[in-house]
């Protein structure tokens, strides 16, 4: 195909028409002349039998469509009759390309049709004439009784298919009929309504020239916008599997104080059925939805006060609009000569004002892109697209993606390109710094980030002086506080709480890491347990270790107080109000300050104090309501089994008579036992991480882990060299070497050197709380399963009964 030819493709019938609907057909000698008052575009016409020839780049107002037309009958207002039996119709139909704001006369040349001078058009007969297969008509025109089909004219475009049979009495008015007896070929064309007056043509600066990379056709319809059909040999959509972007250029009337407004805005993909922009059609007529980008600039006077450029809100401010398909990234050499500037071919697109092209004689040969295809000249209609833009709904903002945004360079009326300011976050470009600052409000997550960060802590600020003052506060910290250092990363902290929180980060990172002791073979998956092991086994200063954080203490009472930090327990409650405290000293301070009234009367059973004797008597009745538990060794009665246990331990045993019912720990005095019981109230059970052992007292749990789950036995007996994990176990063992029975039961012959074993003997044998007794040793148990386990362990040779 030659460079100046367009290949025509069959499409659905569109129309070319006489927009004014007047009498525009007359006889001119041997020719019938049809006048079309509006601009006509012809596009998307491809067929093996129909091609477009003689496209003259120097004269863009002419496009020649050649077709084999056998018979054409045109009548103005009367029926054709008395014509020769057969009339030949010219093969050439001359239709000019789009010309704006002017009346265009098209001639349909019929050199082979013989019409006498004295015969009117109404006398022409059509008995042996052939009709075309397709008729394209529009607006105020009417087609009636063509062949055997009746056709109605709709709104702006009417499609009619004519059967190519001989005509007998058919009438065609105000229309051009193109016939072809070959396979169907549809001329796809549409008109552009021009509402501007002739005086509008004075301003040539409002024209833009859009360069097309490939041979293409432009189709404009009043309701659907401009369509660019690029049909190159290599479709970019097919090669890259991605359609090029679509750029919408909006030109606004500028506020006198806002001369620099302009920029680029991304728009989401358009829906195919609602899109008024540019559609790129491949040869298979498959619609690919491109991305859209809106580039805007300003000219002359208007008022643009909106901060955010919203598609719906700016509809009233649109001055001109043109919708452009994506061009190649190169710039034509002729465009560079017009601009008298060297423009980078990899960065710019060709947007040349048509006024400049006119100044150079409308030489389309000199205005070509890299592929050598001629450029199409378009006029920016002031009224085009206003209704479409107003109907568009506000688009949702797209999240910024990682692709590179293309830059559209717009040459304004003054002949200079716009200067853009890119957003460093999403890549969008703006003409003024003011618009860029307004756009930055769409990135609040970046605005929320503060500039200055403290290297010693997590403090951040936007003010340098605030950071300086904060750093000074670190300098005031004592050296002792700064000595708190993380063992893993070396970071310093001002207090132990911050260090503990920081270590939790390392704990999560090294969850599967095994920690080994440097001094023995002990290893554990938790750093806290390793720290506890080091302090308890290899250090004599802090033998009591917290199982949660690994902190060591000299005394067990300190460990108990510390554990309340992790559990949040407040075992000490005020007896006069709802105040609770984790420390008994704080409770005493509360009572002295809040309840300063003297309470000299005390209950003998629970040691509660009261302000008068009546309150004590009422309180004593509570203890005397039910005493069903009788002691076997005396006449003492208790209201519950716990009181009975305490009675047996305190009265009928000699060592630590006051024993805790939860952990079986004994005390010398009831007051000590009461303080100890308060620790268990409201306290959760602590689970050993290595076995199923559970206990409410964290101190006992720590002792359990040290004694059971450590491999080393640092405490050795000097006599038998037996090893023990704890020092108290060694002390118990040393009593066995003395040969002396320390604890003797008053009710039986049982004796032992182990105080805890003696307590268990008294409770299990000499109380009724253990109803299930062993048949061999009379030891009592709470449940039958415990008794059976005891028999299997200690009386295995006898077996179960």
Swiss-Prot record:
InterPro entries: Transcrp_activ_Zfx/Zfy-dom (IPR006794), Znf_C2H2_sf (IPR036236), Znf_C2H2_type (IPR013087)
GO-annotated biological processes: fertilization; homeostasis of number of cells; multicellular organism growth; oocyte development; ovarian follicle development; parental behavior; positive regulation of transcription by RNA polymerase II; post-embryonic development
An example molecular function term from Gene Ontology annotations: RNA polymerase II cis-regulatory region sequence-specific DNA binding
Residues annotated with Phosphoserine modification: 270
Zinc finger region(s), C2H2-type: 421-443, 452-474, 484-506, 515-538, 544-566, 572-595, 601-623, 629-652, 658-680, 686-709, 715-737, 743-766, 772-795
Annotated localization: Nucleus
Keyword terms: Activator, DNA-binding, Metal-binding, Nucleus, Phosphoprotein, Repeat, Transcription, Transcription regulation, Zinc, Zinc-finger
Organism domain of life: Eukaryota
Cellular compartments per GO CC: chromatin; nucleolus; nucleoplasm; nucleus
Gene3D superfamilies: Classic Zinc Finger
Record remark on domains: The binding of ZFY to DNA is mediated by the interaction of the GGCC core base pairs with zinc fingers 12 and 13.
Known role: Probable transcriptional activator. Binds to the consensus sequence 5'-AGGCCY-3'.
PANTHER family: CHROMATIN-LINKED ADAPTOR FOR MSL PROTEINS, ISOFORM B (PTHR24381:SF393), ZINC FINGER PROTEIN (PTHR24381)
Protein family (similarity comment): Belongs to the krueppel C2H2-type zinc-finger protein family. ZFX/ZFY subfamily.
Protein's recorded name: Zinc finger Y-chromosomal protein
Organism: Homo sapiens
Gene: ZFY
């Amino acid at each position: 195909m030659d460079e100046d030819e367009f290949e025509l493709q069959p499409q659905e019938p569109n129309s070319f028409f006489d927009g004014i609907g007047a009498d525009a057909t007359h006889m001119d000698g041997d020719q019938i002349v049809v006048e079309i008052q509006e601009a006509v575009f012809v596009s998307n016409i491809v067929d093996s039998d129909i091609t477009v020839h003689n496209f003259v780049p120097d004269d863009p107002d002419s496009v020649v469509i050649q077709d084999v037309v056998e018979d054409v009958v045109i009548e103005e207002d009367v029926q054709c009759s008395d014509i020769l039996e057969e009339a030949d119709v010219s093969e050439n139909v001359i239709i000019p390309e789009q010309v704006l704001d002017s009346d265009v006369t098209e001639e349909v040349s019929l050199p082979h049709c013989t019409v006498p001078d004295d015969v009117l058009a109404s006398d022409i007969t059509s008995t042996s004439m052939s009709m075309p297969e397709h008729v394209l008509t529009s607006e105020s025109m009417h087609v009636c009784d063509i062949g055997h089909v009746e056709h109605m004219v709709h709104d702006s475009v009417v499609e009619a298919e004519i059967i190519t049979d001989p005509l007998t009495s058919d009438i065609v008015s105000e229309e051009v009929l193109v016939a072809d007896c070959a396979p169907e070929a549809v001329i796809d064309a549409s008109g552009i309504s021009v509402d501007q007056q002739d005086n509008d043509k004075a301003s040539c600066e409002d024209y833009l020239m859009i360069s097309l990379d490939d041979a293409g056709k432009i189709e404009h319809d009043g309701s659907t916008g401009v369509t660019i059909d690029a049909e190159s040999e290599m479709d970019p959509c097919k090669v890259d599997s991605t359609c090029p972007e679509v750029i919408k250029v909006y030109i606004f009337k500028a506020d006198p104080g806002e001369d620099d407004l302009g920029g680029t805005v991304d728009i989401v993909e358009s829906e195919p059925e609602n899109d008024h922009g540019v559609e790129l059609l491949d040869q298979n007529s498959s619609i690919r939805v491109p991305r859209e980008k809106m580039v805007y600039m300003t000219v002359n006077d208007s008022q643009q006060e909106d901060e955010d450029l919203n598609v719906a809100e700016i509809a009233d401010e649109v001055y001109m609009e043109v919708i452009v398909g994506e061009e190649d990234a190169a710039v034509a050499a002729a465009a560079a000569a017009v601009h008298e500037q060297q423009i980078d071919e990899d960065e710019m697109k060709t947007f040349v004002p048509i006024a400049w092209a006119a100044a150079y004689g409308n030489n389309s040969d000199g205005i070509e892109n890299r592929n050598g295809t001629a450029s199409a000249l378009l006029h920016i209609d002031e009224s085009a697209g206003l209704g479409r833009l107003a109907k568009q709904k506000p688009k949702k903002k797209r999240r910024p993606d990682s692709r590179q945004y293309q830059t559209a360079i717009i040459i304004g009326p003054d002949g200079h390109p716009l200067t853009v300011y890119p957003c460093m976050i999403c890549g969008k470009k703006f003409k003024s710094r003011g618009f860029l600052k307004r756009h930055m409000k769409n990135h609040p997550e970046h605005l929320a980030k503060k500039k200055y960060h403290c290297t010693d802590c997590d403090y951040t600020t936007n003010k340098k002086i605030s950071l300086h003052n904060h750093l000074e506060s670190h300098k005031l910290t004592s050296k002792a506080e700064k000595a708190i250092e993380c063992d893993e990363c070396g970071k310093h902290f001002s207090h132990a709480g911050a260090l503990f929180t920081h270590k939790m980060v390392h704990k999560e990172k090294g969850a599967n890491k095994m920690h080994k002791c440097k001094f023995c073979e002990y290893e554990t998956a938790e750093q806290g347990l390793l720290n506890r092991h080091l302090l308890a086994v290899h250090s004599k200063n802090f033998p009591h270790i917290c199982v949660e954080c690994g902190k060591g203490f000299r005394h067990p009472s300190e460990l108990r107080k510390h554990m309340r930090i992790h559990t949040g327990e407040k075992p000490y409650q005020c007896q006069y109000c709802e105040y609770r405290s984790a420390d008994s000293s704080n409770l005493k301070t509360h009572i002295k300050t809040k309840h300063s009234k003297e309470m000299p009367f005390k209950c003998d059973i629970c040691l509660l104090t009261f302000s008068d004797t009546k309150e004590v008597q009422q309180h004593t009745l509570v203890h005397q309501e039910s005493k069903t538990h009788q002691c076997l060794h005396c006449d003492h009665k208790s209201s519950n089994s716990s009181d009975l246990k305490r009675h047996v331990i305190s009265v009928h045993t000699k060592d630590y008579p006051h024993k805790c019912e939860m952990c079986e720990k004994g005390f010398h005095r009831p007051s000590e036992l009461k303080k100890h019981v308060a620790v268990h109230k409201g306290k959760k059970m602590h689970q050993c991480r290595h076995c199923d052992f559970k206990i409410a007292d964290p101190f006992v749990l720590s002792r359990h882990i040290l004694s059971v789950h450590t491999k080393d036995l640092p405490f050795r007996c000097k006599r038998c060299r037996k090893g023990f994990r704890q020092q108290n176990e060694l002390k118990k063992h040393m009593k066995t070497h003395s040969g002396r029975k320390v604890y003797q039961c008053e009710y039986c012959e049982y004796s032992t050197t182990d105080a805890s074993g003696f307590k268990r003997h008294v409770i299990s044998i000499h109380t009724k709380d253990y109803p299930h007794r062993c048949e061999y040793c009379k030891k009592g148990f709470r449940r039958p399963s415990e008794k059976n386990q005891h028999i299997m362990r200690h009386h295995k040779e006898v077996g179960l009964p």
